[in-house]
Structures are given as C-alpha cells and as structure tokens.
Regions:
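Cofactor-binding beta-sheet edge motifs in enzyme active sites
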Residues: 1-193
Length: 193
C-alpha cells in the first residue's frame, strides 16, 4: 500500500520548530532543520541539499539538522533516480535558504524599526550594520514566520564567489545515524493493516 500524506498533527512533523517556508525551520536553540524532499540512494542529497540551504541562510554548518520530507504534495517530486536529486533541487533549495534569510532580516529590521537595507545576515544572526546590534535566528523565527514568505522576486541569491559551505569538503550529515543504526529507511516503515 502507500503512506498517507503528513498532517499537521502527524508524528512525522517536527515539534518545537518554526517553519520559514516548506523546507526550512528554525528552533529557539539556534539549530536549523532542512527538510530534504528526495530520498538518499547513496549519492548524498541529504548533505548536498542541506549545504545549499545553509549557504544561503548564512548559518553555521554545525547548526544544521536534516529531516526527510514525509509524503506530501508540498514537497514536490519525491522520487529518486539517475543521480538527479541535487541537480534538480539545487536552485530551489538555494531559494529556500535565501527566502528564510530574507524573512529573518526583515523581522530584525521591523523589531529595530530600521530600514531592511541596514541589516545583514551573518553566522545565524542578523546584524544592524550601523550599530552592531544583533539578534539570533532563534529569537527572530516566530516574528519572521508571522510576516510571511516574500515573493521570489524580492529574494537575492548569493554569488557563487561568496560561497563558504557549498563546494567545500565535508562528511555526510547523516553518517552518524547510518553507522549507529538510527537511520530510518523505507523498509523500516510499517503501514497499518
């Protein structure tokens, strides 16, 4: 049979996280959870797509957690094959990270009553450049989510020349779960009946 779509009260939905769009959520402990839409069949999209989001979000890679998307149309095509996951989702995940960053910057600017242009995201915080004041992503997440997702036309992607995470060597983010047996695979899922 098949797995039903995730509902708001589903155990597959993370708790304690503030969603900033479909693929990014921020917690008050300053961690960021990236929901990856494609299963990992060995090529590492859980790591590469999370790196892509972290790059645009301006968050430390060590603060990133990954969650596999549950069944649901909001996550788009969830198939895997032909080593296409990273190629197909790269730009969309860049946009997801950049959109979350823009939401957090706007929330900080509103909190300080300053122009958005005077604020910038850096290392999991938003800084007001003229004064050096900072607010953490965790402290801004609720107000950022309440402001809503800006249109893509109002979101700017970084230049690849500015990348500090993408293109750098790293271990796969899910290696600890794989080697300790905590990773959940399709064969681990039990459907009632």
């Amino acid at each position: 049979d098949h797995l039903p779509p995730a509902s708001p009260d589903s155990p597959n939905r993370p708790t304690g996280l503030v969603p900033l769009g479909v693929f990014v959520a921020v917690d008050t402990d300053e961690s960021v959870t990236v929901t990856v839409p494609r299963p990992d069949m060995g090529q590492g999209p859980r790591t590469s797509l999370a790196m892509t989001v972290a790059e645009e979000l301006e968050v430390d890679w060590t603060a990133v957690r990954v969650r596999q998307a549950p069944a649901g149309s909001e996550y788009g095509d969830q198939t895997s094959g032909g080593s296409t996951s990273t190629r197909v989702h790269h730009r969309g995940m860049l946009l997801a990270g950049a959109t979350a960053r823009e939401m957090l910057v706007r929330a900080a600017a509103a909190a300080w009553g300053v122009p958005r242009e005077s604020c910038r995201a850096t290392a999991g915080t938003v800084e007001h450049s003229p004064t050096g004041r900072r607010l953490t992503y965790g402290s801004l997440a609720e107000s950022a989510a309440a402001m809503g997702v800006p249109p893509a036309s109002e979101v700017t992607l970084k230049s690849p020349a500015e990348y500090t995470i993408v293109g750098r060597p790293t271990s796969r983010i899910d290696n600890p779960d794989v080697v300790t047996g905590r990773a959940v695979y399709g064969s681990d899922v039990r459907v009632p009946g």
